[in-house]
Amino acid sequence: MTDMFRPGKNARRAVLLAVAALFTATIWGAQDKPGAPAPPPAATQPAEYVGSQACQMCHEDISNAFQKNPHHQVETGNTHGWATRACESCHGPGSKHADSASAADIRQPAKLKPADADKICLTCHLNQPTHVGRINSSHARNQVSCTACHSIHKNGPNGLVARKQADINKLCAGCHADVWASFQRPYKHRLPEGAMSCVDCHNPHGSFLPRSIQTVSANEPGCFKCHGDKVGPFTYEHAPMRLEGCTACHMPHGSSNPRMLTRSQVQFVCLECHSNLAVPAPAANASLGGVPPAFHDLRSPRYQNCTLCHQKVHGSYVDRGLLR
């Protein structure tokens, strides 16, 4: 007879199987029981500041370049409370990154959303005169962050990515290709040659004037930094100068027309406002009317070179007709 028919041995097996089943059911029941407390998560310690010297141990090349950058003043001074830990003023506390050497354990402004990256810069730069309009500027509205034009580590004028004035212009041209094309026309501001810069006329951080135009004083556009003789104040002003500005007659970047005019000849510019060609021929010495009024038969060639007589087209101190 085999062992399976031995009563004593079978009884022992049955008892062992019952105990094992009961133990297993107890464990699974405890896991499935509603409200059973989950094991507590491991405590996460926040990163701490370790100072720039810890950063230099691995990032020596960046540290050497940073010493020539205007932002290095944050490291050596205490203007904003970041002395000896300038790296962490932008990248945040670095203890975890120092331990793990993982990029995931440090803030990377270049990978943040533009608005979030700008907040870091504006912590220090918000109240500077050239930056007061940054939040509502056209660059900010179009998601162009500070780091698109500025380098935090490299050495350049005012921390710019570009080092030379001509390179700054090319930096702007990287986005404004249509404007750059205007500077290739025969009559232009000498910007491609490096004689002037985009920021001579535009404030890239924002302005109270359209197109981020620089202001000289009050609401006067930046044109008058160089062309001050055209602004007055005049006793007799030419209304478009005050109401529309220089671009009523001139192309600001470049033109195919002399003096960067919007039209091929001066009289065609004048006729945009002073046109009375729809009025019948007048009697001798009579005004043709029009809005604004004109006093000559402009269909006659003798009256089509306006600036032959009206020489002070921007404004005059002595003559209401802008003759002199």
Please state what every model-predicted region is.
Residues 23:
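Flavin (primarily FAD) cofactor-binding/catalytic cores of flavoenzymes
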Residues 12-20:
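Sec-dependent N-terminal signal peptides
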Residues 3-5, 13, 26-324:
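Short sequence/structural segments immediately N-terminal
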